[in-house]
UniProtKB/Swiss-Prot annotation:
NAD(+) binds at K198, S251, G272, E403. Its EC number is 1.2.1.90. This is NAD(P)-dependent glyceraldehyde-3-phosphate dehydrogenase. Coiled coil: none annotated. D-glyceraldehyde 3-phosphate binds at N175, R303, C304, D305, H463, G464. The active site is at E270, C304. Transmembrane segments: none annotated. It comes from Saccharolobus solfataricus (strain ATCC 35092 / DSM 1617 / JCM 11322 / P2).
Length: 509
């Protein structure tokens, strides 16, 4: 295997790091300044666990100064930039992402362990999200409220404005560092908020490159910053009163920790998932098997909307099981994501694979039967696993109760849709679900009772750029992400009431 290293060809992007002994030391961006560090954090490729770069480990004084600058100046700089200009900036960012596409694809492959097609897909999605910011604009409009619906408010009227809350902290996950950051930038700043971005410690490089793109696109320099500190040091930041809203994509445990420490703020959180796929007796089984297999193995299961439970009506269980095993056998090729034949690359780190192994052992000890995969092929490489799980012990299994961020699915035979509903809804998570079948009455009942944020009919769950809103119920999140839908969580409503009593403007009957 060829040793991993960061390959950046664009001169503009090469300005954000210095090579020392062959290792790139990246700077971070704090409100108009590129900052190096007194301390450094290693960035490790999941492909071979090689150190591919170092990023600054900021201290509290640096973060405090940045918060103060953005609170005092930056939140007004972005608000005073006309909306038309903000849209132009997004378009420039999209153009620059396209210009630097090769560099971003290479870094996503090396830093995230993504296959080339997956990395290209993320860059494409980021570009499309920037270009579709115009669809968010209509949600920045306010309302007019007449006063003649109450005797107390006769001869008055009000305008209800939607205003930016001020400063938004955006905490980005490791799995889609470029797209998720772009998405958070658009819905946060399109209405005029300043943004502070906390990149994932494991995959920060695409975000630091994006900061350069923002600078080149003339994004208001005082209005954004990238704070590179470990997640364990974030409690003081999330609790800071200068931050008015927090946007987080991450685990349920991280979300709970943020809520405990943040105080009174607005939240938008997309948290733990791992979705059920329900297969009805009249489903197109070949199609269902193909789509479910894709939902299990896509990005090695490191997606919040990855398929983790497969619930199959007993009449077609054996057939679906055989077809699913065949699809996995045909689809899975584990290896170096730089190899164009690879379909399943590495998991992000060793500890996640350790947890995956532990969960498999737990499932087998509780009566589970491995139908496919389940082998560890290296420190960060796995064979996606399919486990036949008995209903009697299912709810005691680690995989059922905890989202494991690697390819794994439990296959369960159910008598009917009521049993499928009970098993699905008994989990603490409620992000998405998939239903495969034709019976509209069964599908309609499942739609009504599934406690999830989105349901995909005859396909596996995937959120894309957010044309359709998504988000979790129960422990899977707060609020909804989606084009035009998320602005409400980073918005303050302000009612401005005009009193015209006795001015002769209205003559009521």
């Amino acid at each position: 295997m060829e040793k991993t290293s960061v390959l950046i060809k664009s001169k503009e992007l090469m300005e954000i790091y210095e090579l020392k002994d062959g290792v790139p030391y990246f700077k971070t961006y704090l409100s108009g300044q590129w900052i190096s560090g007194d301390e450094w954090q290693d960035v490790i490729s999941p492909i071979d666990l090689n150190i591919i770069g170092k990023i600054p480990k900021l201290n509290w004084n640096q973060i405090d100064d940045t918060l103060e600058h953005i609170y005092r100046k930056g939140r007004w700089s972005i608000r005073d930039t006309p909306g038309e200009k903000r849209l132009d900036i997004y378009k420039k960012m999209a153009s620059l992402l396209d210009k630097f596409k090769e560099d971003f694809v290479n870094v996503l492959m090396i830093n995230n362990g993504k296959t080339k097609s997956a990395a290209e897909g993320e860059v494409k999605a980021a570009i499309e999200r920037l270009l579709r910011a115009d669809l968010d604009v209509k949600e920045t409009r306010g309302d007019y409220v007449p006063g003649d619906w109450s005797s107390e408010t006769l001869e008055t009227e009000a305008v209800v404005r939607k205003e930016p809350v001020g400063v938004v902290l955006s905490i980005v996950p490791f799995n889609y560092p470029l797209f998720d950051t772009v998405n958070k930038i658009v819905y946060t700043t399109v209405i005029g908020n300043a943004i502070i971005i906390k990149p994932p410690s494991s995959t920060p490089l695409p975000i630091l490159m994006l900061a350069k793109v923002m600078e080149l696109a003339s994004f208001p320099k005082d209005s954004f910053a990238i704070i590179t500190i470990p997640g364990r040091d974030m409690n003081k930041v999330v609790g800071d009163k200068r931050i008015q809203a927090i946007s987080l994509t991450g685990s349920t445990e991280t979300g709970e920790e943020v809520v405990r420490n943040a105080g009174i703020k607005q939240f938008i959180m997309e948290l733990g998932g791992g979705d059920p796929a329900i297969v009805l007796s009249d489903a197109d089984l070949a199609w269902a098997a193909q789509r479910i297999a894709a939902g299990i193995i896509s990005y090695t299961g490191q997606r919040c909307d990855s398929v983790k439970l497969v619930l199959v009506e007993e009449e077609v269980y054996d057939t679906l099981k055989d077809l699913l095993i065949k699809e996995l056998t045909k689809s899975v090729k584990v290896g170096d994501p730089r190899d164009p034949l690879t379909t399943v690359g590495p998991v992000i780190d060793v500890k996640t694979v350790d947890e995956w192994e532990k969960a498999i052992k737990d499932a087998v000890e509780k009566g589970g039967k491995i139908l496919f995969g389940g082998k560890r092929l290296g420190p960060t490489y796995i064979e996606p696993v399919l486990i036949e799980a008995p209903k009697e012990t299912l709810k005691d299994m680690y995989f059922y109760n905890k989202e494991v961020f690697a390819s794994a699915a439990l296959l369960i035979k159910v008598k009917n849709i009521d049993e499928a509903l009970e098993i699905s809804n008994s989990r603490k998570y409620g992000l998405d679900a998939a239903i495969f079948g034709k019976d509209i009455n069964k599908i309609r009942k499942l739609q009504r009772f599934l406690e999830v944020g989105a349901i995909y009919i005859n396909d596996y769950p995937r959120h894309g750029i957010g044309y359709f809103p998504f988000g979790g119920r129960k422990d899977s999140g707060i609020g909804r992400e989606g084009i035009g839908y998320t602005i409400q969580y980073v918005t303050a409503y302000k009612s401005i009431v005009y009193n015209y009593k006795g001015k002769g403007i209205w003559e009521y009957l």
